[in-house]
């Protein structure tokens, strides 16, 4: 599984043929910078990553350019952690959207969106998701209160199957998601450590 947060901020490069030079290999390939990954785009049902928005460098440092769209199946991760386009013909922008057959206007960007149950209970906001690099299908979404709160108490790891859809600026999930235990927070880890210490202490007392 790939984490969308792990991809954010990574530089994206596109292959380009090197200029012909005396003695150079005719098929030599160099990389040109496209930009940096800054947002994941999900399918209308919210359960599949269709690609990423890539912030492109401003022209002459002043004229802002529109984001590029990089399809989920059109890049590979290089040894240095940067991304390289692998489908030059239909891996970017309109060509990629057409190939994937996505309804662009209905696609969703979950990151930072509030999440609540179908009955209206607020769970926090969407902070991350992991997805299968071979299919684009989301495994889980991570929902928490953010900042210090998330660091202390952790996040809800909500299976994609619990996502009901989008409504009024919110991710709607199954009511059962409210019963998922928080995980990953410092308090939770401290609690686990206390529980383990308590068990060990009990065992030691029993042996004594």
What are these regions (language model features)?
Residues 1-208:
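Peripheral interaction segments used for macromolecular assembly
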